[in-house]
Amino acid sequence: MSLDIITPPATTPISRAELKTHLRVDTTAEDDYIDTVILAATDYFQQRSWRQLITATYGLYLDEFPTDYIEFPKAPLQSITSIVYEDTNGSTQTWSSSLYEVDVKADVGRLRPIDGESFPGTDTVYNAVTITFKAGYGDAATDVPDLVRSTIKLIGAYFYENRQNILTTGSVSEIPVPMALGHLINQFSLREFV
């Protein structure tokens, strides 16, 4: 299984003005850096929680369909755009949405064939199945839960005050944060994918 972002979010869960107010910064000298901090804090939260905060479109690639159901590695799942696969003859097919059902209410979105149906057979190639889906709380920052937005501000403040951590770490998700921030993130974490 692999995951690729197709259409990134159009905005961030907090604005520059919100983080500047939180930081008590009233100059414009560091606006570009603050924008970078917002992106890093958002990325950190999303990587650690397996959640997508603002609506984005993803491609999920599978070598074959499972036998029972598919769980989506980004939540909350909004919708399935398409399911395309290579059939056993090597031809590209689109699986009709009338043949499967989607659970967008569960913490981890799921998809399975409707009763009486089964997943189609696939060719024995890598990434034979491509599922395009949308995930996120919504299109606007105000759609994101307030506790998540507050957590992003706290992570952003930590990154702002500890700049060397952002510059010396290979991956945003490897940056150490205070234990309290880790606990806030864990409240939203989808542990099945960690």
Model-assigned labels for residue ranges:
Residues M1-V194:
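Divalent metal-cofactor coordination and adjacent catalytic microenvironments
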